[in-house]
Design a protein with these regions (language model features):
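Single conserved hydrophobic/aromatic residue that forms the stacking wall/gate
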Residues: 1-7, 11
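Nucleotide-activated donor-binding/catalytic signature segment of Leloir-type glycosyltransferases, i.e.
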Residues: 178-225
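A short helix/loop element that forms part of the nucleotide-sugar donor recognition site in Leloir-type
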Residues: 118-132
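Conserved acidic donor-binding segment of nucleotide-sugar-dependent glycosyltransferases
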Residues: 269-282, 289-296
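Short hydrophobic beta-strand element within catalytic cores of glycosyltransferases
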Residues: 235, 255-258
């Protein structure tokens, strides 16, 4: 037998009390386009359930950002077949109940990232490491900018913001690349490289940005320096359910400003952080100005205390352990 076949047989022979789904894409493949995978997923769930397994699903997304029909169907199956669904906020739970009124649900917050990154980094040391101004008021937007709407929203508001020492730190802003991302399409490849080497430096100087290409990941060793160097963390999504950048910012004692949507808007409002209407530039400017004041008043310390009391790994882990017991005991 092949090694792969032996592994498959070994998995089938095991007994599991709990199977915990995090990302349905991870089960079927992040770019899956095989229609037969849906049948196999349903069969596998039925098989393990027949052997006494119970299923828990943590709802990170309503649907993936780039989902196809097969992945969306996988979401439907896992949502409907799970014995308990864990949500990171009441917003998600209430929305889910409208679709699955008979489902069992629990609310468990996203954990803060204790013991994951270097935490004892001063603002001065972080800015020195990243070669950033010690005097700038730095607003950081983490993560890949997914579309032009997010770019326009952030750049439009930031350019209009009347803050003399402002700097936008956006490591994955621009849709350009120095890599051969377009294969044999010479024109697109040339435009992308020209944007990377010529337009990016020009725009950074013009608009007080420290921004990079959206296909270049931040090294995990560098990530805590970006966080520590910031005054405010900006969540640049227009439509999103959860963001790990919020608990990460809380761990680093930072103020967070984000859209008034999903679990994010709920958490930020409850903790005294500014929220905004993502389609209203004036409202974004108001939120940025409020974030600047809150940073000076110590809201970052309030966020850290809240995170440690309500989102610690220990507390979140205990909540999931209780959820597993609930699933097993029915």
């Amino acid at each position: 037998l092949s090694i792969r076949r032996q592994r498959q047989m070994c998995i089938r022979d095991r007994h599991y009390d709990i199977i915990h789904f995090q990302w349905p894409e991870e089960v079927v493949g992040w770019t899956c386009n095989d229609p037969d995978i849906i049948r196999r997923l349903e069969e596998r769930i039925s098989f393990f359930r027949s052997r006494g397994a119970r299923f828990v699903y943590t709802r990170h997304n309503v649907r993936p950002h780039y989902a196809n029909g097969i992945i969306s169907r996988a979401y439907d199956i896992i949502e409907s077949q799970s014995d308990i669904v864990a949500h990171m906020g009441r917003f998600s739970r209430d929305e889910f109940l409208t679709k699955y009124p008979d489902s069992q649900n629990v609310v468990i917050p996203h954990h803060i990232y204790q013991y994951t990154y270097k935490e004892d980094i001063s603002v001065e040391r972080a800015r020195q490491y990243l070669n950033l101004s010690q005097d700038a008021f730095i607003v950081t937007a983490f993560g890949k900018f997914r579309n032009r709407e997010e770019i326009r929203m952030v750049l439009g508001a930031f350019r209009a913001w009347d803050e003399e020492h402002k700097m936008l730190l956006a490591p994955r802003l621009y849709p350009f690349s120095r890599r051969n991302s377009y294969g044999k399409n010479f024109i697109k490849r040339w435009i992308s490289k020209a944007g990377y080497y010529l337009l990016m430096p020009l725009l950074n100087r013009m608009y007080k940005l420290q921004a990079g290409a959206n296909d270049e990941l931040i090294d995990n060793c560098d990530l805590p320096y970006y966080m520590a160097a910031s005054d405010v963390i900006f969540i640049q999504r227009k439509d999103i359910l959860n963001s790990g950048n919020v608990p990460l910012a809380f761990l680093y004692h930072k103020v967070v400003v984000g859209p008034k949507v999903g679990n994010i808007g709920e958490l930020l409002s409850e903790t005294g952080n500014p929220t905004f209407d993502p389609d209203d530039k004036k409202d974004i400017l108001r939120a940025l100005e409020e974030a600047r004041r809150l940073a000076a008043w110590g809201q970052g310390e309030v966020n850290y205390t809240y995170g440690m009391e309500n989102m610690s790994i220990r507390k979140v882990g205990q909540a999931y352990a209780q959820t597993y017991k609930q699933a097993i005991n029915g």
